[in-house]
């Protein structure tokens, strides 16, 4: 079929018009899209493009320092160097991993794993090793032409100038773990950073750590740094806050030396505000070990040593309190009206209950004793019989009222609650109807399933000193903000034990005075020449070895300032071992912080 010239022209005109129409349509779509991108969404896309072009480089702050109550530095900072590498450069140079692994003394496979696991883009540097020595830095500097993308940052590490370790109060730092990286996601932690693992370093991590700063660099399409962005001012890092502890470093040093190589703990509290003046747990550890790179051998020692040096025995370990807990039973019986302080029994050295003889620590017996004398001489038979009159339920209720079976709330965390057994507890552990009242006799003298922490016993001494008032134990006295130079005081929480009268406290306190100052007192080794001390000894039986030695007390008797607990694992007699240690600590405290009091104030006691 042939087209005429007119038909051909019509067809050409049609195609031309169609082409123009399609072109116009496509151009219109393009214009609309440009309008949408630049006018409607322009601001959003501009911000996104700037984010892609501008990168923020993190500037780490100096960690806050830690001082004792009088301003002596316990923890400071000193320079340390960390080696980093840019993943893109490592992948581009053959043999660089082998060379770098040799310099850093890290297996090559491990080095590759670090880079692969922690890189965030090809051009973001990854920390390979922290706290490298000067020999390593020198090699990297000398061989920098063969190590493209490898460099070092100046950071800081902890140092400990004090003679006192204060280990379990200060705690220690360690590299942030994968779990912690996930937990604190978005808070700026990266692989190789350090974080508080224990003590105030852990509890006050956010304050000590400070706030990151940032400087801004321009990067190209591949993410490589081109230049620093001068138009955008860098944000300076904000140093961490300094902590001033309640600890007195002189008393702490003495306490550490008195416990020496023995296992145990010692706590001294200010009864007027709950300040912890010293807290020792033995064995302890040298915190400076954790300031460096801890070796596998060192970590294995800390984790698997049978004496568990990282464990804070003052707040984490629980023990039977022995005769120190007789004070709780006395309070329960007196407040419930079950006895008066004149109620007496005759101690022959043992008490027959059912088919079993329950012994007193004094085999030939104490003779006739009332409550005052029973506390003074720590007569087991008296408290065996008193427990049967009082009952398990009352005994447990008053134990909980006085702070046992729950945490004290001390600000170093990782605290144990202890155990105050009641009927429900015994039913669940031994079966309903499978336990007998004989268990109550063991509980009466601080044995059996009853478990307490040394800090809980120090808190009991504070409660008795203050006639029921007590403060939350705490180790941080104030916080100092180095930028504004402002001090932030710590709020002190106080409480009053409910349901125990002033009269009952007075009776029990008088018994405690006799323990230290009476002719037959078991705690006479804690007595001071010019200051009246009140206390209670304990010798807790231990199924796994020798007895534990306990002493709790407070002083001065009439105007209490401090409460103390000394617990020596497998130490033997509380009166012979723990009480003399308490005396030396109290002596040092009153030497350093003297009080004007009348010489030992006599107390008129209704003792038969």
Where are these regions (language model features)?
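Periplasmic/cell-envelope proteins involved in peptidoglycan metabolism and beta-lactam response
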Residues: 1-297, 306, 318, 338-343, ...
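Beta-lactam-recognizing serine transpeptidase/beta-lactamase-like catalytic domain environment
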Residues: 2-6, 10-13, 75, 220-234, ...
